[in-house]
């Protein structure tokens, strides 16, 4: 596993404390009847199956599933883990038994960043979480609210196009430009101003890296939590949490000190809810946690999805040609594509789906946890078992998809399969109670950016590079970013 490869001192610490852990396990061992568990690869003492998880966990788990089946039982240190790698098993977990698997496991990093679990993404399944989720769905991310911010998206996309035009057909770093346009939209919608993007952009990347699965020893070995202090992780997390709080406190104070209706953003909406219902759960820490959810998840996942989509189109000129024909035909005589035009673009929607299928930004859905003992597909699953849905593996399953490793948007034309959580072979936003409520928010940005870029420009690789030279390797992490930046030459279409 990446943490063991990069930090071999962990194994040293493990060996020093073998006696402690064995004593702990002996003292806490209960005489229980043997359970009918799903198939499991061989485990090592203490670390369980951690040694079998490489730097790309989704690929390692897919390879194990090909040998042991779509339901596997693993041990990550002291933590029992159920790995789901088929659409049928995902449907059982996320629909039939959604409530049982609605909890989140403890994450030491998320707990520190999000004020002891006050956000929506990582919070435990409680009445507090249900209230917060309801507020996000009905007040922040409803269709009406998302549509009300159309002018923000259109203004920022106009600026993106201008920046590319100003490159005068020289090499442009499309990765940076996509992060900028996404960050500006998310920041303006969340806190009222795009000027604050630089204040949190670096923090987001640092925190996303620390939230990556397997970063914290404490999460898998509670008795060895102090190792995170020795390795410096706790210090980094504390510093990041302080940076987040300083930034968000400044945003709150700025809003509270402003009279009138200067702001029309998520912070203002949450402050209004707080003022209207003094007995609600909407305290300042809740507001800050929710805003950081929006800033972090929104900026990182949307910009990453955009980068993969444009890289895939450049890599596959036939798909690019078809998309440009559609967009330019619908946009004929127009200087830009509006959101009203997007609903007419069937091939664009197929391209977006195919990009999300082949290049999952979050290949492993955020882990869930069983709230009670359950008989699941004939197996005994105990309360407290983590549940990992390998959505990346499901979306590349050759039993479900024809030639799954190929970029073929046509597979989604005249297909009922979408990304809203009802088709379990395709789960880019998850499903069930814990599914992402920001689907429309994300897709409005994605489609508008891609449509306008392919409408206005023809893209080439710089320095005479060939299409096969375009690196489509992913960097490991909680989100799968492109390993190398997307450098292009954007020539205006005439």
Curated annotation (Swiss-Prot):
The chain crosses the membrane at residues 12-29. It is an enzyme of class 1 (oxidoreductase). Changing residue 120 to V: No effect on the activity. Keywords: Endoplasmic reticulum, Heme, Iron, Membrane, Metal-binding, Microsome, Monooxygenase, Oxidoreductase, Transmembrane, Transmembrane helix. Psoralen possesses photocarcinogen properties. It intercalates in double-stranded DNA and cross-links pyrimidine bases under UV-A irradiation. Psoralen is widely used in combination with UV-A radiation to treat a variety of skin disorders like psoriasis or eczema. Involved in linear furanocumarin (psoralen) biosynthesis. Converts marmesin to psoralen. This is Psoralen synthase. It comes from Ammi majus. The lineage of its organism: Eukaryota, Viridiplantae, Streptophyta, Embryophyta, Tracheophyta.
């Amino acid at each position: 596993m990446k943490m063991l490869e990069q930090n071999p001192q962990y194994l040293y610490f493990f060996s020093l404390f073998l006696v402690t852990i064995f004593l702990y396990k002996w003292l806490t061992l209960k005489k229980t009847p043997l359970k009918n568990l799903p198939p499991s690869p061989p485990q090592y003492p203490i670390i369980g199956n951690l040694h079998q998880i490489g730097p790309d966990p989704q690929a390692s788990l897919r390879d194990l599933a090909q040998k042991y089946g779509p339901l596997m039982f693993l041990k990550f240190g002291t933590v029992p883990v159920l790995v789901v790698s088929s659409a049928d098993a995902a449907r059982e977990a996320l629909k039939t038994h959604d409530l049982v698997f609605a909890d989140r496991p403890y994450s030491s990093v998320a707990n520190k960043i999000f004020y002891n679990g006050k956000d929506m993404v990582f919070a435990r399944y409680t009445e507090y979480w249900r209230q917060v989720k309801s507020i996000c769905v009905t007040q922040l991310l409803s269709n009406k609210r998302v549509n009300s911010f159309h002018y923000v998206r259109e203004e920022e996309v106009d600026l993106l196009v201008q920046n590319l035009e100003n490159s005068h057909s020289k090499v442009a770093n499309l990765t940076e430009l996509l992060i900028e346009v996404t960050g500006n939209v998310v920041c303006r919608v969340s806190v009222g101003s795009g000027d604050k993007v630089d204040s949190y952009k670096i923090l987001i990347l640092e925190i996303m890296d620390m939230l990556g699965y397997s970063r914290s020893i404490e999460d898998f070995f509670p008795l060895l939590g102090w190792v995170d202090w020795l390795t410096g992780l706790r210090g980094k997390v504390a510093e990041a949490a302080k940076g987040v709080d300083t930034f968000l406190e400044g945003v709150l104070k700025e809003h509270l000190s402003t009279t009138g209706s200067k702001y029309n953003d998520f912070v203002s909406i949450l402050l209004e809810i707080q003022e209207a219902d003094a007995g609600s759960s909407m305290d300042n820490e809740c507001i800050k946690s929710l805003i950081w959810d929006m800033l972090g998840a929104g900026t990182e996942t949307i910009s990453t999805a955009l980068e993969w989509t444009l890289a895939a189109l450049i890599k596959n000129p036939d798909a690019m040609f078809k998309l440009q024909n559609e967009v330019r035909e619908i946009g004929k005589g127009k200087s830009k594509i509006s959101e009203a035009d997007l609903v007419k673009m069937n091939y664009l929607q197929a391209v977006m789906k195919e990009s999300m299928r082949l290049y999952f930004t979050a290949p492993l859905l955020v882990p869930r946890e069983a709230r009670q003992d359950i008989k699941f597909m004939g197996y005994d699953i105990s309360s407290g078992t983590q549940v990992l849905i390998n959505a990346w593996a499901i979306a590349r399953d050759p039993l479900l998809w024809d030639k799954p490793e190929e970029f073929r948007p046509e597979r989604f034309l005249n297909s009922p399969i979408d990304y809203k959580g009802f088709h379990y072979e395709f789960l880019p936003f998850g499903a069930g109670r814990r599914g992402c409520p920001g689907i429309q928010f994300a897709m409005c940005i994605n489609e508008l950016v891609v449509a306008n870029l392919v409408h206005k420009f023809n893209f080439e690789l710089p320095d005479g590079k060939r299409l096969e030279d375009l690196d489509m390797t992913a960097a490991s992490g909680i989100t799968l970013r492109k390993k190398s930046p997307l450098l292009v030459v954007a020539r205006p279409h005439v």
